[in-house]
């Protein structure tokens, strides 16, 4: 308490010395440095009531144990990105033609061009048709060349891909001529697995613990990721992609929960940002491997092999002490904390361990119904669901927009992924200087600006939305790609702030459940994007991006700030902390007036 009084005295002395400047600046009663000092004081007050923060200080805020934990927790994010975006690289193929090898029986020395010219009908523009062929006739080669073939039909013996340099799912299962929608089916199956995985793993994470949820999700990546390489039918491929999506979302929920509950203050923010950087590295790694491998099965084989070393997590990954306490496992929580302290070469004072008891020795219980009963929890869930819906819708809309512009699949992935790393690192500065709430608002505001610019840039190769007399179409197309890249930059920052902010807003007893419920909105956003783009002009999807970003920006103002605040443990913890901070601000204002 003496330290607090000295701290307050320092604040009052600085306030008195700058009293003249305060009156000169209307609407700014404190200078920036004074605001920083006040924020530190509020952090001291709130931290005193957080037993786990004090314990983690004694353990070592970010010692060897925490550094190892962050590395172990987020390195698998590389493989999550690998399997999440793999579909984009296994559905590529050159234009196919009907298999007309029957003519080689009468003309074995025909070149590929001569074979196509004799057996495949042509479109009015001179290109060969993909889905039709001339029916075979019992003639010799000279008669076929002299009289030609006239009777056409659909392909009888499959297709050939004369210009294909790689073996993809398209030429593996002949997904052409009415089967092109199978590609969208694969994407829909992957998206369908996300909400189911969210529901399954939020139960596992909150009921069984963060540690078993992480192990189960990694096991799913090994089984479904490695097994995909051996699928001999497209339906089995869809089933395994469905399983992979559940594992990916399960790992995201459980890993963020574990890292959030082991770290304090800005270390928590830095760890989640680092995890998202690993995710971007995974997307770049996928692009490089997919570019170099000639077969789609090899891609999944390599991915499955890279996940196998994570089996060792069974012996080296710890459980969350916060979750153990919420489940009444005080002894196990103390053991985990003491082990962490020994790794960091620290000693936890016995009085701190003795304070680690449950209030009235009752186990904290919560259910999904609390998201409806608790007003604050309901508000947080709805607002964050709106933000996640906006992010998902915008991501898929812009990805399809890039494809419309004729950008190669490798460029569409590697460049935005590289840009994501500095975007996420910039969040460190934002989160430290302006907090979680305003960081989310700033990134959403950037999204609004870039979407508005897209409304006035060219629609694609067929024409321009507005007349730009001094700019050729190629330059306008380049401008559109640049704006899309900048929008990806803002989107990456929004996702990073979103995950950290959401994890800090939700209480420990329902953190994984809340993350799972919020992630359901991403599926709805993706489905809406795919539906609108396939049925409406290109102007409406971008316009909806602007509208949704404005709505999310407005709703974000309803959320409380979590910077320098302890993690919520129970359903009423957040309201208690806010009341204490409000009382402290009132006392500070009263002392300033005196």
UniProtKB/Swiss-Prot annotation:
Statement: the UniProt record of this protein carries the keyword Glycoprotein: yes
Pfam families, per the entry: Sugar_tr
Record: glycosylation sites: 99, 117, 125, 150
GO MF: riboflavin transmembrane transporter activity
The keyword Mitochondrion belongs to this UniProt entry's keyword annotation: yes
Residue ranges with Basic and acidic residues bias: 580-594
Gene3D superfamilies named in the record: MFS general substrate transporter like domains
Tissue-level expression: Ubiquitous.
Any one Gene Ontology cellular component term annotated for this protein: mitochondrial inner membrane
Primary subcellular site in the record, as a coarse category: mitochondrion
Effect of residue 487 to A: Strongly reduced riboflavin transport
Transmembrane spans: 71-91, 185-205, 211-231, 236-256, 271-291, 298-318, 380-400, 409-431, 438-458, 489-509, 513-533, 539-559
Record localization: Mitochondrion inner membrane; Cell projection, Cilium, Flagellum membrane
Extracellular side: 92-184, 232-235, 292-297, 401-408, 459-488, 534-538
GO terms (BP aspect): flagellated sperm motility; sperm capacitation
Region (Disordered): 566-594
Domain of life the protein comes from: Eukaryota
Catalytic activity as recorded in UniProt: riboflavin(in) = riboflavin(out)
Protein family per UniProt: Belongs to the major facilitator (TC 2.A.1) superfamily. Organic cation transporter (TC 2.A.1.19) family.
PANTHER family reported for this sequence: SOLUTE CARRIER FAMILY 22 MEMBER
Name of the protein: Solute carrier family 22 member 14
Organism: Homo sapiens
Organism placement in taxonomy: Eukaryota, Metazoa, Chordata, Craniata, Vertebrata
Name of encoding gene: SLC22A14
């Amino acid at each position: 308490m003496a330290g607090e009084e000295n701290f307050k005295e320092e604040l009052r002395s600085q306030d008195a010395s700058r009293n003249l400047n305060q009156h000169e600046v209307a609407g700014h009663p404190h200078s920036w440095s004074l605001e920083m000092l006040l924020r530190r004081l509020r952090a001291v007050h709130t931290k005193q009531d957080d037993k786990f923060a004090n314990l983690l200080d004694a353990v070592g805020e970010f010692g060897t144990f925490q550094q190892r934990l962050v590395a172990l927790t987020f390195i698998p994010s590389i493989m999550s990105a690998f399997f999440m975006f793999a579909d984009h690289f296994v559905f590529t193929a050159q234009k196919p033609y009907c298999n007309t090898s029957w003519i080689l029986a009468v003309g074995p020395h025909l070149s590929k061009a001569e074979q196509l010219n004799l057996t495949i009908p042509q479109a009015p523009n001179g290109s060969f048709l993909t889905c039709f062929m001339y029916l075979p006739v019992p003639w010799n080669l000279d008669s076929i060349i002299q009289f030609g073939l006239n009777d056409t039909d659909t392909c009888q013996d499959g297709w050939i891909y004369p210009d294909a340099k790689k073996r993809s799912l398209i030429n593996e299962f002949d997904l052409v001529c009415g089967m092109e929608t199978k590609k969208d089916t694969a994407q829909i199956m992957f998206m369908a697995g996300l909400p189911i995985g969210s529901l399954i793993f939020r139960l596992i994470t909150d009921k069984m613990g963060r540690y078993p949820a992480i192990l189960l999700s990694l096991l799913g990546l090994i089984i479904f990721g490695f097994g995909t390489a051996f699928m001999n039918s497209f339906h089995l491929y869809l089933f395994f992609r469905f399983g992979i999506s559940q594992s990916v979302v399960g790992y995201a929920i459980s890993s963020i929960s574990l890292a959030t509950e082991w770290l304090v203050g800005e270390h928590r923010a830095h760890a989640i940002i680092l995890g998202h950087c690993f995710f971007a590295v995974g997307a770049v790694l996928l692009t490089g491997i997919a570019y170099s491998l000639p077969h789609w099965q090899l891609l999944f084989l390599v991915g499955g092999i890279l996940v196998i070393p994570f089996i060792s997590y069974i012996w080296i990954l710890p459980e969350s002490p916060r979750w153990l306490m919420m489940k009444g496992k005080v002894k196990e929580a103390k053991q985990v904390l003491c082990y962490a302290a020994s790794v960091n070469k620290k000693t936890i004072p016995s009085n701190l361990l003795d304070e680690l008891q449950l209030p009235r020795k009752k186990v904290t219980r919560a259910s999904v119904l609390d998201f409806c009963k608790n007003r604050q929890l309901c508000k947080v869930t709805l607002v964050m669901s709106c933000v996640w819906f906006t992010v998902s819708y915008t991501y898929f809309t812009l990805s399809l927009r890039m494809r419309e512009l004729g950008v190669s699949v490798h460029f569409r992935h590697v460049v935005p992924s590289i840009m994501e790393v500095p975007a996420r690192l910039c969040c460190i500065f934002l989160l430290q200087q302006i907090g979680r709430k305003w960081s989310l608002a700033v990134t959403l505001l950037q999204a609004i600006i870039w979407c508005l610019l897209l409304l006035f840039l060219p629609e694609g190769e067929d024409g321009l939305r507005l007349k730009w007399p001094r700019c050729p179409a190629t330059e306008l197309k380049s401008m559109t790609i640049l704006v899309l890249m900048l929008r990806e930059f803002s989107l990456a920052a929004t996702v990073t702030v979103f995950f950290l902010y959401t994890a800090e807003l939700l209480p420990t007893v329902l953190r994984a459940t809340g993350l799972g419920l919020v992630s359901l909105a991403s599926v709805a956003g993706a489905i809406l994007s795919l539906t609108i783009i396939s049925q409406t002009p290109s102007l409406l999807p971008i316009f909806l991006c602007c509208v949704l970003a404005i709505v999310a920006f407005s709703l974000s103002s309803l959320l409380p700030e979590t910077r320098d605040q302890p993690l919520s443990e129970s359903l009423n913890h957040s309201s208690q902390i806010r009341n204490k901070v409000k009382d402290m601000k009132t006392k500070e204002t009263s002392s300033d007036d005196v």
